[in-house]
Regions:
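C-terminal, charged and often intrinsically disordered regions of DNA end-processing helicases
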Residues: 1-34
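Secondary-structure capping and boundary motifs in well-ordered enzyme cores
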Residues: 16-27, 47-55, 72-76, 111-115, ...
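Short, well-ordered alpha-helical packing segments
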Residues: 4, 29-36, 77, 81-84, ...
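A non-catalytic, helix-rich entry segment at domain boundaries
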Residues: 27-108
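Active-site-adjacent bridging/hinge elements
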Residues: 2-9, 52-56, 123-136, 179-180
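Substrate-binding beta-hairpin/strand module that engages nucleic acids
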Residues: 45-52, 96-98, 156-180
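Non-catalytic protein-protein interaction segments used by genome-maintenance enzymes to assemble
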Residues: 98-165
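Short, well-ordered loop/turn and helix-capping segments at boundaries between secondary-structure elements
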Residues: 8-12, 33, 37, 138, ...
Length: 180
């Protein structure tokens, strides 16, 4: 009781436990982020092998059983191919790519309430607008959920972008809110 309630300690999983879907999703996001930050040419034949090298590094401790890790790497390879195809199709219209960008928007009139958001991707398009992208490794919210504010993440990130609270990106409108 003391450890749980006073010290607020939580039970840790035993060694060798499979990571949760959330943990795997975080690792996949990390691979995409690292790839974007590396600024590699999407058209080079080395793009996929380089991304898979980053994935192997990220997944190195995924499972003590090599075969289990290899299954996840194979799944990621399929996602990496789709990611690269998507990026290549739209490369000509993108001026800047910002990965895993955190913003904070302070509202002094609301007792200094701060809205904090971390966008998977903020891509500045040639027309000056943003495309806000959220990579989903699980279910994708439906448009009706977004408009009913039951899945407000991208809408809030668009408001934050318009307010200019993401570092390195001037205030601008969003022309696309995309789940991948």
């Amino acid at each position: 009781i003391y450890a749980r309630h006073v010290l607020a300690l939580k039970r840790i999983e035993p060694l060798g436990t499979e990571p949760s879907a959330r943990e795997r999703g975080t690792m996949i996001h990390g691979v995409f982020e690292k790839f974007v930050h590396a600024g590699l040419d999407l058209d080079l034949p080395e793009a996929l092998p380089k991304m898979m090298e980053m994935a192997r590094d990220a997944f190195a401790g995924l499972a003590p059983i090599k075969e289990r890790r290899d299954i996840w790497l194979k799944r990621l390879e399929r996602a990496a191919r789709q990611f690269l195809d998507y990026e290549r199709r739209r490369d000509a219209e993108i001026v800047e790519r910002h990965a895993e960008t955190k913003g904070e928007w302070l509202f002094p009139a609301l007792d200094n309430f701060t809205l904090v958001g971390k966008a998977d991707r903020l891509d500045v398009k040639r027309d000056g607008t943003l495309e806000i992208i959220d990579f989903k490794t699980g279910g994708v919210p439906q448009p009706k959920d977004m408009t009913a504010f039951e899945a407000p993440q991208l809408l809030l990130e668009a408001a934050m972008a318009r307010a200019g609270v993401f570092p390195g990106i001037s205030p601008r409108d969003s022309s696309a809110l995309t789940y991948i």
